[in-house]
C-alpha cells in the first residue's frame, strides 16, 4: 500500500484515499514516518489513528446493512467484539481467518505501530480495544464461497516506511466451493539459477530457469520470460502439474530477477523495479531492461536451453504484467504472446507493429482498479482485431491465482501443444 508522490506533491505529504469503504492514510513509500516527524510533518501513523473512529462507524453501518454497495465486490465491515472471545477463536495461530455469513474475519497477534493485511485482500488491520498486540479485519466479500484468498501481514514499526516487515503468512483462505489445491510434489523438471553479466545493464542480474521433464530428447520447446523471475521457484510446481496432466504445453520458463533487494533495509531510495517495468516513468532503465531481456537473455537461453527460436511469451504479474504488455507492444519481433496477470498500468494505445501478438489478460474481482484497467485494455485489443483472452478470478492481487493462471495462459497462447487440447 502507498505510492510515489506525484509531480507538485510534497514527498513528505500524507494523503488519503478511499478503499473498500475505508479512508486510508498513505504517503510516498520511500519516505519513513521518522523522516516526516523530524521535519515536523504529520505522519501516516498519526493520520491513521485519527481516521480510525470514523472508519469504524462506517464499517459498523455496513455490517448492519448486510449487503455490498452497488458495483463493489468487497467492503469493510466491523462489529465490536469481546477481546477474550476473539483470542479464543484465534487459538494458537498467530494469523487466523474464518468465514461467517459471507464475511471474512482475520485476526493477527503481533507487535507493530501499524499492521497491513496483504495478499488477496489489502487493508489496514485495526487494533482490538482492550487487547494490546491483537489486530483484526473483517470484510464482506461477494462469492466468498468460491474465493481463494492468500493472507499475509506486514508489521510496520514506529517511524518506518510503508514497506514494513513480513510478520505472518501466507495463510490461504479457501471458500467451500473454491478450486482445489494442487498437491505439493517434488519437481521432475530442472530448476537452475544463473548470474548473467549484462553489458546493457552494466551489472550482473540473476535468472532462474525451469525446464520441464523430458526436454532432453533433442526437441525444442516454447520459451516464456517471466518478470520477477525469483518467483519461478513458486510457479514451476503448478506449471509442471499442468504439463503432466496435459492441460498446459511443455514450456521453458526463464525468470529474469527484478532489481529490488529482498531485504527492505537495503532497498535504495528509488523503486528500481517500477523504473524497469513501467514505461510511464520514462526512465532509461526501462529501455535498458527490455533490451537486456530481448537482446541478451533470450539469445543466451537459445544457446544453452532446449528452447525454440521463437516467438517467445512475455509474462508477468502486477507491475511485471504491465512490463509484459509493454514488451509485446515494443518488441513484437521477439514476443508473439503476452500473459498479463493483474496489470494495473496499461498503454494508452495499441502499437500498430504488435497486431499479431496474442494476449491473455486476467485480473481478480477483488482488485477493482486493476480489474477495470484489464477489461479496458482487453476491449481496446479486441476493437483492433487482435487475438485476446480476458479472464477473471474470484480473488484479489494474489500469487495463488497468478500461479494458477499461468498454465491456462500458456495453453491459450500456444494452441495445440497441450495434450488435452
Language-model features, listed with the residues they occupy:
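Charged/polar low-complexity intrinsically disordered segments
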Residues: 9, 17-18
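N-terminal amphipathic/hydrophobic targeting modules at extreme N-termini
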Residues: 12-14, 24
Amino acid at each position: 500500500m502507498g505510492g510515489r508522490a506525484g509531480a507538485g506533491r510534497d514527498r513528505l505529504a500524507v494523503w488519503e484515499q478511499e478503499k473498500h469503504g475505508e479512508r486510508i492514510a498513505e504517503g510516498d513509500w520511500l519516505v519513513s514516518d521518522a523522516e516526516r516527524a523530524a521535519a515536523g510533518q504529520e505522519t501516516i501513523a498519526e493520520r491513521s489513528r485519527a481516521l480510525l473512529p470514523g472508519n469504524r462507524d462506517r464499517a459498523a453501518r455496513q455490517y448492519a446493512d448486510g449487503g455490498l454497495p452497488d458495483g463493489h465486490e468487497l467492503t469493510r465491515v466491523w462489529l465490536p467484539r469481546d477481546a477474550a472471545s476473539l483470542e479464543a477463536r484465534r487459538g494458537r495461530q498467530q494469523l487466523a481467518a474464518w468465514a461467517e455469513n459471507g464475511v471474512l474475519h482475520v485476526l493477527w497477534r503481533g507487535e507493530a505501530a501499524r499492521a497491513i493485511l496483504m495478499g488477496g485482500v489489502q487493508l489496514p488491520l485495526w487494533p482490538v480495544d482492550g487487547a494490546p498486540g491483537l489486530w483484526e479485519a473483517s470484510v464482506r466479500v461477494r462469492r466468498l464461497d468460491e474465493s481463494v484468498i492468500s493472507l499475509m501481514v506486514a508489521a510496520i514499526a514506529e517511524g518506518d516506511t510503508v514497506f514494513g516487515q513480513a510478520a505472518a503468512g501466507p495463510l490461504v483462505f479457501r471458500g467451500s466451493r473454491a478450486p482445489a489445491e494442487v498437491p505439493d510434489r517434488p519437481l521432475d523438471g530442472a530448476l537452475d539459477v544463473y548470474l548473467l553479466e549484462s553489458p546493457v545493464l552494466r551489472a550482473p542480474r540473476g535468472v532462474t530457469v525451469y525446464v520441464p521433464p523430458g526436454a532432453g530428447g533433442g526437441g525444442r520447446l516454447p520459451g516464456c520470460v517471466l518478470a520477477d523471475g525469483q518467483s519461478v521457484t513458486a510457479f514451476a510446481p503448478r506449471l509442471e502439474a499442468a504439463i503432466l496432466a496435459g492441460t498446459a504445453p511443455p514450456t521453458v520458463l526463464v525468470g529474469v530477477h527484478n532489481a529490488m533487494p529482498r531485504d527492505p533495509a537495503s532497498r535504495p531510495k528509488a523503486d528500481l523495479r517500477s523504473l524497469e517495468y513501467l514505461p510511464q516513468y520514462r526512465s532509461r532503465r526501462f529501455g535498458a531492461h527490455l533490451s537486456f531481456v530481448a537482446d541478451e537473455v533470450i539469445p543466451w537461453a537459445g544457446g544453452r536451453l532446449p528452447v525454440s527460436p521463437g516467438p517467445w511469451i512475455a509474462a508477468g504479474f502486477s507491475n511485471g504484467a504491465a512490463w509484459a504488455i509493454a514488451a509485446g507492444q515494443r518488441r513484437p519481433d521477439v514476443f508473439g504472446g503476452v500473459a498479463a496477470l493483474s496489470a494495473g498500468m496499461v498503454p494508452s494505445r495499441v502499437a500498430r507493429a504488435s497486431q499479431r501478438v496474442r494476449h491473455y489478460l486476467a485480473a481478480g474481482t477483488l482488485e477493482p482498479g486493476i480489474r477495470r484497467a484489464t477489461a479496458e485494455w482487453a476491449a481496446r485489443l479486441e476493437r483492433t482485431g487482435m487475438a485476446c483472452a480476458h479472464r477473471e478470478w474470484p480473488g484479489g492481487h494474489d500469487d495463488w491465482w497468478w500461479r494458477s493462471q499461468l498454465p491456462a495462459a500458456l495453453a491459450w497462447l500456444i494452441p495445440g501443444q497441450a495434450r488435452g487440447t
